[in-house]
């Protein structure tokens, strides 16, 4: 139990406290635009700790009333990494295996390249869009423009 509680504290600090604190600092210093990288499926109502913390952070950041507030919700990120982790290697392999069957409504769960996500963030930031939540289908389209 202790390790589970410690893990949930770490998750909350990383996925909720840190972005909300940064958001408040930005808001207090009159930063007009804020882009938050969340996760596909994020919701404060989820039981999954990662998705719940991401969803709670989205809600708190939204309350800060930035002129332009963008939420980026990528699926499983792939691409170059400084450090390789076994769990991520397994995830990448698994996504490659199941990707061909992710069609229709499931298509948004396909892995997405981090470079595409970065390009879409830049394109959205430079656009007239004032706010919105962007998931993989939109990110793929905007990131290739």
Please annotate each region the language model reported.
Residues 34-40, 72-74:
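SDR active-site strand-loop-helix element
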Residues 44-132, 137-143:
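Oxidoreductase cofactor-interface core, primarily capturing Rossmann-like NAD(P)-dependent enzymes
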């Amino acid at each position: 139990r202790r390790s589970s509680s410690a893990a949930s504290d770490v998750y909350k600090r990383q996925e909720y406290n840190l972005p909300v604190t940064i958001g408040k600092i930005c808001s207090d210093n009159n930063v007009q635009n804020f882009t938050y990288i969340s996760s596909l499926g994020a919701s404060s109502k989820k039981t999954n700790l990662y998705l719940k913390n991401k969803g709670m952070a989205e809600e708190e950041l939204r309350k800060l009333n930035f002129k332009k507030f963008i939420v980026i919700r990528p699926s499983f990120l792939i691409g170059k990494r400084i450090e390789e982790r076994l769990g991520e290697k397994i995830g990448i392999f698994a996504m490659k295996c199941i990707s061909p069957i992710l069609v229709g409504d499931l298509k948004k769960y396909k892995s997405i390249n981090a470079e595409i996500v970065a390009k879409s963030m830049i394109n959205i930031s430079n656009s007239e869009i004032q706010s919105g939540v962007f998931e993989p289908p939109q990110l793929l389209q905007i990131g290739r423009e």
